[in-house]
Amino acid sequence: MGKRFPSGWFSPRVHPPRRQRSPMTNQATPGTASVWNNIEGIGFGGDYNPEQWPVSVRLEDLELMQEAGVNFLSVGIFSWALLEPAEGQYDFGWLDDVMDNLHGIGVKVALATATAAPPAWLVRKHPEILPVTADGTTLGPGSRRHYTPSSAVYRKYAAGITRVLAERYKDHPALALWHVDNELGCHVSEFYGEEDAAAFRLWLERRYGTIDALNAAWGTAFWSQHYGSFEEILPPGVAPSTLNPGQQLDFQRFNSWALMDYYRSLVAVLREVTPAVPCTTNLMASSATKSMDYFSWAKDLDVIANDHYLVAADPERHIELAFSADLTRGIAGGDPWILMEHSTSAVNWQPRNQPKMPGEMLRNSLAHVARGADAVMFFQWRQSFAGSEKFHSAMVPHGGRDTRVWREVVDLGAALQLLAPVRGSRVESRAAIVFDYEAWWASEIDSKPSIDVRYLDLLRAFHRSLFLRGVSVDMVHPSASLDGYDLVLVCTLYSVTDEAAANIAAAAAGGATVLVSYFSGITDEKDHVRLGGYPGAFRELLGVRVEEFHPLLAGSQLKLSDGTVSSIWSEHVHLDGAEAFQTFTGYPLEGVPSLTRRAVGTGAAWYLATFPDRDGIESLVDRLLAESGVSPVAEADAGVELTRRRSADGGSFLFAINHTRAAASVRASGTDVLSGERFTGTVEAGSVAVIAED
C-alpha cells in the first residue's frame, strides 16, 4: 500500500493545450491540420485486420478497397500477439507487406500501437497487470482491455512495442496518424488494484498538497472518516453503506486522468521518434459513456476521433446520433473530427441486433459529416469468420460483393468523394448546451433527492427539440467561451465552479438568453452544498431562491398553469428579482413559480423548476428561440434533419437528410453536390441532399 512511484511516472504534457475557440472561428489547430494534409478529400475506410486472413484474401481486399473508394484505414489495433509472439521476438513481415500494399493503392494508414490487448505471454509473466474490480475480483485474459493503466510493468511493455513500431514505420509513406491504444475505458473504466490504489493516493497528494486539505474537501468530519495520512486512503470499493461522495467524485476524476496519462506515456514515445506524425485515440462520446472526461482529454489529442453505434431499439436513434456528433464536435472545439468507428449494419453486442434499414448507413454517415466529421470509418473492413465479433457487420460482409451492404458501401464511397469540397468547413451555431462530465458524475453519485434525476434526460430533451426544429446547437464546456451564442441552455448542472458560473452569468449580461434548470449550481467542485438557498451558484443571476426540493414519486405528474404537465421534479421557488411566467397548480405548491425570467444586462436569465412534458418543452423552446432570435438552419418538412457547414471562404453547404418514407420539401437554393444538378427543393424518401448554396 505504501508504494511510491518513481520520478517521471506521471508523464508530462507532451504538447501545448488545444486552443479554445469562439463559435465562429474557422482556424484549425496545427495538429488537426496536419492530419488532413495527409488525406485527400473526406477520409473513408475502417478498421483493417489483415492478420485474420490469408494472403489471397488480402490481395482481394486491395481490389475491393479501390472499388469502394477507400483512402484511410486503421491497422494493427489488436495485433500485438502476432507482432511480438514472444518477448523481444518480432514478426513484422505481414505488416510490412500490408503497409506497402496500401501505399501502392493510395491508402493512408492510422497505425495502431497494438496495445489494447496484451499478449498471453505478458499476462503469464506479469499477472499483476490485470485489472481489479471494486469487489476485489481480478479480471482475466481471453477478451480484451485486460490491463490497468497504472501498472508500471504494463506501461513499460506498451511503450516498448510502441517504440519498435514507431522506429520501423517512422518513414513509411502510408503513415498518416498514430492510433494510440483503442477505446480507452471501454469495458473497464475503474481500477481498484494495489497499484491503482497507490497511484490514487499519489494523485490525491498532488491535488491537495496536505491531508488536512483533503479532509476539508471530502468533509471527513462526517461518519468519523478523518484521515491522518494519505497512506490510509483506499479506493472507494464495496462498503457497508454509502461511500463518501467527495471520495467517489475524486476517484472518477482519477480514473479518467489515469487512462489519459497512460495515453500520454505512449504519445511521449511517438513524439520522440515521429514528431511530425499526429496522434489520437478513439473516444466513445455518446449518451451511453460517462466515465471519461473527454473535454479534459481533448488537449492531448491532435485530432478528435470518436466511435458511435446506434441502439437498434431506439426509434429516434438518428437523434441520439446527432447528439453524439454535436458532443464530439464540442470536444473538438469546432475542429473537423474523425468518425473512427460505426457500423454498416447490425452490431453483435445488443440483446437483439437488428440490421440497418436500406439507406440508413448513408444517412448515418452523412449525418456525422454534416455535424463536423471529415472522415467516415467503420468497424470493420471485412467481417470476421471467427471470434466474438464475427456477427458484427462490416464493409465487406460474409456474403461478399453480392449484398445490399456492399452496394451501399460503394455508393457511400462515391458520395464521399463528391463531398471533398466540404472538408475543412465548420458547423456554425448560435445556440449552445452546456455539458460537463464532472457535473454528470457528481449529480449521479448516490444519496440525492431523487434517483429519477439523471443528468442527460433534460439536456437531451432540449437537444431533441432543437434538432426537430432544424436549429444547430453546440455542446460546450461550462468554462469555454460563450461569446457568439445567443441562446445558452444549462441543464441539471448540479456542480459548478465559481469561474464557470460567472462565465454563464456573463453570457446573459452580454445579451444571451440563458436558461438554467432545476438541480443546477447546487454544489461546488468539491460537492459541497452552496449555502443560502438553491440554486446556489446561480441564485443571484436568476433572481430566485429555492427553499425546498419537492421531487415527485415515480409516475406522478403535476399540472402547470399553462395547461401542460411535468414530472420528476418540483420545488418551492421564491422570487427575488425575477418574474414568474408559469406556476405550479395544486397542493402544496399552488401558485409557486415553475418558470421565471430575470432581465440581466442586455440579455435574460430564465429558470425552469420542473421537467416539462414534450408539449411543455416545445412551448418553452419556441419562447426561447423567439426571444434570442435564433432561427432554424432552413425551412423544411417535418422529418428532415438540417445542418449547415460553412467554409473559411464563405461558401456554405446545407445538409438535408430525409428520415421519412415520403418525399420532403426543403427551402434552399443551390447545387446538390451529390447529383451535380440544381436542387429542386425536394429530397426523396430516405435520401440526402448536400446543397452548395448560392
UniProtKB/Swiss-Prot annotation:
Sorted UniProt keywords: Glycosidase, Hydrolase
Activity regulation, per record: Strongly inhibited by glucose. No activity is lost during treatment with 100 mM EDTA after 2 hours. Activity not considerably affected by metal ions (5 mM), including Na(+), K(+), Mg(2+), Co(2+) and Ca(2+). Completely inhibited by Cu(2+) and Zn(2+) (5 mM) and is strongly inhibited by Mn(2+) (11%), Fe(2+) (25%) and Ni(2+) (38%) in comparison with the activity in the absence of cations (100%). Activity not affected by dithiothreitol, beta-mercaptoethanol and L-cysteine whereas reduced glutathione almost completely inactivates it.
Domain of life: Bacteria
Active-site residues, as the UniProt record annotates them: E183, E341
pH-activity dependence text: Optimum pH is 6.5 with ONPG as substrate. Over 90% of activity in the pH range 6.5-8.5. Highly efficient at pH range 4.5-9.5.
Pfam families the UniProt entry points to: Glyco_hydro_42, Glyco_hydro_42C, Glyco_hydro_42M
Compositionally biased region (Polar residues): 22-31
Influence of temperature on activity: Optimum temperature is 50 degrees Celsius with ONPG as substrate. Active at 4-8 degrees Celsius. 60% of the maximum activity is detected at 25 degrees Celsius and 15% at 0 degrees Celsius. Over 50% activity at 30 degrees Celsius.
CDD domains from the UniProt entry: A4_beta-galactosidase_middle_domain (cd03143)
GO molecular function, one term: beta-galactosidase activity
Region feature (Disordered): 1-31
Biotechnological applications listed in the UniProt record: Has potential use in lactose removal in milk and dairy products at low temperatures and for cheese whey bioremediation processes with simultaneous bio-ethanol production.
Any one Gene Ontology BP term: galactose metabolic process
Catalytic activity, as annotated: Hydrolysis of terminal non-reducing beta-D-galactose residues in beta-D-galactosides
Record-listed substrate binding positions: R144, N182, W349, E389, K390, F391, H392
Subunit structure: Homotrimer.
Described purpose of this protein according to its UniProt entry: Hydrolyzes p-nitrophenyl-beta-D-galactopyranoside (PNPG), o-nitrophenyl-beta-D-galactopyranoside (ONPG) and chromogen 5-bromo-4-chloro-3-indolyl-beta-D-galactopyranoside (X-gal), with highest activity against PNPG. Also acts on p-nitrophenyl-beta-D-glucopyranoside (PNPGlu) and o-nitrophenyl-beta-D-glucopyranoside (ONPGlu), but with significantly lower activity.
Protein known as: Beta-galactosidase
